[in-house]
Amino acid sequence: SLIQALIGSILLLALPLWKKAHGEESIQAEKKMKVLPISQTLRIPGALMTCLLFLTFCAIEVICGGWSATYMVEAKHMPANLAARATMYFYLGMALGRFLSGVAAKKLTPWQIIFISMGILGVSQTTLLVSGNNVLTMAALLMTGLGVGPLYPNFNYMTPLHFGKDVSQSVMGMQMTFASIGTIAAPALCGVLGQLLGMGIFPAYLMIFYVLTAVGIIALRRTLRQVGRLQQ
């Protein structure tokens, strides 16, 4: 309960930091929004790719939150109470990642924060994949939360910058749709694969979504650069 209270406090403290860093820009840049049909929204250069990114990194969040304890118990033979604590470390890391992202937004660009986050995620996923030590595995879960936490707010913030404020509402709507698909389908598939192959597949399954996220970021930046909308 103490850790849960700490997570809640960190998230509440992060909100004003984001408002201070980006709120004034959003207010000054308000324009009349266009509501586009789905097909037209997804034809905007880079829109489909950013939606797929929301699917993959939101999937990482929910897979870790939903299946890490089961993995620790079944594959690592950890006591259930320690496995639950390991999952709590993941959520603590995610809350801390979003808080630090709000602090860093005053000095770093969203892309710089994303690159740092992906680096942390890469280290954590590799550690999960190769570590046979329970302490290192728990540390890797904390780092996974720390790395994935900043992705959602930073990609969300960049949507009007990359696609135009007039159509950003439509793009954000699709991003939320794809995020919902990721949060529902990815953990369900993990459960099915876990029953068939054993929960030892958990680190490899997470690594697949990390690689998809990394490839998606490269593809998105390339597309945005080609159309002259890439924000540095």
Residue ranges and their predicted role:
Residues 45-88:
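Extracytoplasmic gate region of multi-pass secondary transporters
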Residues 112-127:
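Structural signature of the two symmetry-related core transmembrane helices
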Residues 150-163:
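Intracellular juxtamembrane helix-capping segments at the cytosolic ends
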Residues 124, 135-143:
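Paired small-residue
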Residues 19-50:
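Juxtamembrane intracellular "pre-TM" segments in multi-pass secondary transporters
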Residues 97-109, 194-195:
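Helix-to-loop junctions at the C-terminal end of transmembrane segments
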Residues 1-16, 203-219:
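Symmetry-related core transmembrane helices of the 12-TM Major Facilitator Superfamily/SLC fold
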Residues 163-199:
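A late C-terminal transmembrane helix in Major Facilitator Superfamily
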